[in-house]
From Swiss-Prot:
Domain notes from UniProt: Consists of three domains: the N-terminal catalytic domain, the anticodon-binding domain and the C-terminal extension.
Record keywords, A-Z: Aminoacyl-tRNA synthetase, ATP-binding, Cytoplasm, Ligase, Nucleotide-binding, Protein biosynthesis
Pfam families linked: HGTP_anticodon, ProRS-C_1, tRNA-synt_2b
Subcellular location, principal: cytoplasm
Domain of life according to the entry: Bacteria
Quaternary structure, from the entry: Homodimer.
PROSITE patterns (UniProt xref): AA_TRNA_LIGASE_II (PS50862)
Protein name: Proline--tRNA ligase
C-alpha cells in the first residue's frame, strides 16, 4: 500500500485520465469501471432493469472467448446441445438444496396472455434440472456413458445491485453437464474443466488465478464439491472467474438418471456441471485496465493492431489506402487489424479513442514514414513510441504481441502477490481485509464461523488452494484465525471481499 492508502502499483494518471473523461481508479474505482464499459463501447444500459445491451466491440470480445473454449470442448469429445429457456417450476423443486439456493433469484412465468398457468415456469437460472430430466429418458446402459454435453446461452438470476458483466439479471455463459458411471471419472472431469479454465486465463487472458476447492458454505446449491478459479481485481476484490461442480448422485436420484451396469444392476449416474460466464469480461477490464481505459490482452482482443493513417486533406485518402495495404500484410499473419480511416476526426482523438478501447498496438503511418520505409509503433501499455523499419515492424508483430501478453501476466501476478497477506491473528485478519487485501489464514471449516467472519469483515472464503496450485499451495497446520479450533484443511484458506 502507498502512504495515502492507495493500492501498490496503482495506475494513477489523474491528469491524463481527466482529460479523456475517465474517472481515475484511485478516485473512484466503481465510477472508473462503469465509465470504461460505456465509453469503450463494450456495453450500455437497457430499458430492462438489470439487463445490459452488449455492443459490437463487447460482442466481438465474447465471440473470441466462445471460439477458444468451444474448439477445446469439441476437441475433448464434448457435444453441444440447446435446451429451452423456460423450465417447469416443479423441476426446480425436486432437489431440495438446489431450490433453497436459487429461490430468491428466480424469474417466474405465471401467465400466457391473461390466462393463468396451472404449472408456472422459471426462466433458466442454470440447467441441471431440465438436463437431468432429459437424461433420464436417454440413458439406459453403461454403454451410453459418459454423456459429455454443453450449451451456450443466457441465464436469469434476479440481481438488486447490478454491474455490467459482473452482476446482471441476465448474463451469458456456457454450461457443461456430464454424466459418468463412477465417482472417479466424474471427479476427473470436474478437474479437467477447471484446469482448462485456468489455462485459458493464464495463456490467453493473461489473468493469474488461484485454483482450489470451495468451502461447504460456498458450494453450489446441490453439489457435493465445488471448485473455482479466483482472480484479484485492481481494487483488491476477488472475482470468481469460473467454477466446476461434482454433483455426486444428487441430481441423478432426483431425476431418475440411472443405467444398467455390466453386472445387470441399476446404478445412478455421477454427474458434473461447469461454467465460465460473461463475468470474465469484467475480470479482463478490472485486472488490466488503467486510467486511460481498457488494456486488452492481445490473444483475445477483438482488434490486435490499429493502423492510423496520418495525412493532410489532399493526401488523406491515399494514406488510408496505404494503411489498408499495411493491414493486409498484418492480416496475412493471422492478426486482427483495424484501419481508422475516419475523416474529419483529429489524430489526437483517434489515439485517445483506441487507448480507451485498449487495442494492444497502434501504428501511425504518414507520408514521410511511407517515403522513409518506416512505421511509428506504440504499445498500449507504454508511453514510448518506436520508429522501426517497416519490414521489421511487420515481421515482428506477433512476437511483440506475445511480449505484451507476458508483461500483462507478470504485472497482474506481481500485484496479486503484493496484495495478499498471511496472518495468524484475527486483529491482523481484519486490518488486512480493511486495507483491501486478500488474506491467507487457517480456518476450522465450520459454516457458523465463516458466517461470523463475513458479518465482521464482509470477507468470504474464496477457496482452499489445490496442492498443485500456482499460488498458495503450501500445506501446514494451525488454529482457526477466528475461533482457535484446529484447522480443517491442512493448509490456509484464501479470504477476500468479492464481486
Amino acid at each position: 500500500m502507498t502512504k495515502d492508502g492507495g493500492k501498490k502499483d496503482n495506475q494513477g494518471q489523474d491528469k491524463k485520465a481527466q482529460q479523456y473523461g475517465v474517472t481515475p481508479q484511485s478516485v473512484d474505482f466503481n465510477d472508473w469501471y462503469n465509465e470504461v464499459v460505456k465509453k469503450a463501447d463494450l456495453a450500455d444500459n437497457s430499458p430492462v432493469a438489470g439487463a445490459m445491451v452488449v455492443r459490437p466491440y463487447g460482442s466481438a470480445l465474447w465471440e473470441n472467448i466462445q471460439r477458444w473454449l468451444d474448439d477445446r470442448f469439441k476437441a475433448s469429445g464434448h457435444e453441444s446441445l440447446i435446451f429451452p429457456t423456460l423450465i417447469p417450476m416443479n423441476f426446480i423443486m425436486k432437489e431440495a438444496d438446489h431450490v433453497e439456493g436459487f429461490a430468491p433469484e428466480l424469474f417466474t412465468v405465471n401467465k400466457i396472455g391473461t390466462e393463468e398457468l396451472a404449472e408456472p415456469y422459471v426462466m433458466r437460472p442454470t440447467s441441471e434440472t431440465i438436463i437431468g430430466h432429459m437424461w433420464s429418458g436417454w440413458l439406459n446402459s453403461y454403454r451410453d456413458l459418459p454423456f459429455l454435453h454443453y450449451q451456450w446461452g443466457s441465464v436469469f438470476r434476479a440481481e438488486l445491485r447490478t454491474k455490467a458483466f459482473l452482476r446482471t439479471s441476465e448474463f451469458f455463459w456456457h454450461e457443461g453437464h456430464t454424466a459418468h458411471a463412477d465417482e472417479a471419472e466424474a471427479r476427473a472431469e470436474v478437474r479437467q474443466q477447471l484446469d482448462l479454465y485456468h489455462e485459458f486465463c493464464r495463456d490467453v487472458l493473461a489473468l493469474p488465478v488461484v485454483r482450489g476447492e470451495k468451502t461447504a458454505s460456498e458450494r453450489f446449491a446441490g453439489a457435493v464439491a465445488t471448485y473455482s478459479i479466483e482472480g484479484m481485481m485492481r481494487d483488491g476484490k476477488a472475482l470468481q472467474s469460473g467454477t466446476s461442480h461434482y454433483l455426486g448422485q444428487n441430481f441423478s436420484r432426483a431425476f431418475d438418471v440411472k443405467y444398467q451396469t455390466r453386472e445387470q444392476k441399476e446404478e445412478f449416474a455421477h454427474t458434473t456441471s461447469w461454467a465460465i460466464s460473461s463475468r470474465i469480461i469484467g475480470a479482463i477490464i478490472m485486472t488490466h485496465g488503467d486510467d486511460s481505459g481498457l488494456m486488452m490482452p492481445p490473444r483475445i482482443a477483438p482488434i490486435q493492431v490499429v493502423v492510423i493513417p496520418v495525412g493532410r486533406k489532399d493526401n488523406f485518402d491515399q494514406m488510408v489506402q496505404e494503411g489498408e495495404k499495411l493491414a493486409a500484410e498484418l492480416r496475412a499473419q493471422g492478426l486482427r487489424v483495424k484501419v481508422d480511416g475516419r475523416d474529419g476526426v483529429t489524430n489526437g482523438f483517434k489515439y485517445n479513442d483506441w487507448e480507451l478501447k485498449g487495442v494492444p498496438v497502434r501504428i501511425e503511418l504518414g507520408p514521410r514514414d511511407l517515403e522513409s520505409g518506416v512505421l511509428v509503433v506504440k504499445n498500449r501499455h507504454s508511453e514510448d513510441k518506436e520508429t522501426l523499419p517497416r519490414a521489421e515492424a511487420v515481421s515482428g508483430m506477433s512476437a511483440r504481441l506475445d511480449t505484451i501478453h507476458d508483461f500483462l501476466m507478470k504485472r497482474a501476478t506481481d500485484f496479486l502477490l503484493a496484495n495478499t497477506a498471511e496472518v495468524d491473528s484475527y486483529d491482523a485478519f481484519q486490518r488486512e481485509i480493511e486495507a483491501g487485501h486478500w488474506v491467507r489464514a487457517y480456518h476450522c471449516g465450520e459454516p457458523a464461523c465463516e458466517k461470523s467472519i463475513k458479518e465482521d469483515t464482509k470477507a468470504t472464503a474464496r477457496n482452499v488452494p489445490f496442492d498443485d496450485a500456482e499460488f498458495f499451495a503450501e500445506r501446514g497446520e494451525g488454529q482457526c484465525v477466528k475461533c482457535g479450533q484446529p484447522s480443517a484443511y491442512g493448509k490456509r484458506v484464501l479470504f477476500g471481499r468479492q464481486y
